[in-house]
Amino acid sequence: MKYKLNVLLAEIALIGTGNHYHEEANCIAEWLHLKGEEEAVQLIRLSSLMNRGDYASALQQGNKLAYPDLEPWLALCEYRLGLGSALESRLNRLARSQDPRIQTFVNGMREQLKT
């Protein structure tokens, strides 16, 4: 039950960042931090920065982390910042993933880059 509650709270916080409820999302992130849910905390913080348009700070913060599941978020930052070679390097790393969702993301980003 506790894990399910943590997941639901993280989802609420992410929805909050998308609707510019950054303070509220940060409160949830702080609570999740106390519960040891660091990857969720970092995702909420990255999402908050990105939804404020601060892609440079999100990328800087994200590059310090060791959470492979956050790599697509960092690729989005590189895309928005026009960092083509960094983005291509990240997409090449992501393309080696066995996760079909990551493969779909990489293919979608590469299609987006063509336009």
Swiss-Prot record:
Alphabetical UniProt keywords: Cytoplasm, Plasmid
Pfam families: Type_III_YscG (PF09477)
Organism for this UniProt entry: Yersinia pestis
Gene name tied to this protein: yscG
Descriptive protein name: Type 3 secretion system chaperone YscG
NCBIfam families associated with the record: type_III_yscG (TIGR02508)
GO CC aspect terms: cytoplasm
Compartment(s): Cytoplasm
Entry superkingdom: Bacteria
Principal location listed in the UniProt entry: cytoplasm
Assembly and oligomerization: Component of the heterodimeric YscE-YscG chaperone. The YscE-YscG chaperone forms a stable ternary complex with YscF/SctF. YscG interacts with YscE and binds tightly to the C-terminal half of YscF.
Physiological role: Chaperone of the type III secretion system (T3SS), also called injectisome, which is used to inject bacterial effector proteins into eukaryotic host cells. Along with YscE, prevents premature polymerization of the YscF/SctF needle protein within the cytoplasm. Is also required for stable expression of cytosolic YscF and for YscF secretion. May act as a scaffold to organize the assembly of YscE and YscF into the heterotrimeric complex. Required for Yop secretion.
Sequence similarity: Belongs to the YscG family.
Deletion phenotype: Deletion mutant has no detectable level of YopN secretion, YscF expression or YscEFG assembly, but it expresses normal levels of another Ysc component, YscJ/SctJ. Deletion mutant fails to secrete YopE at 37 degrees Celsius in the presence or absence of calcium.
Keyword Aminoacyl-tRNA synthetase part of the UniProt annotation: no
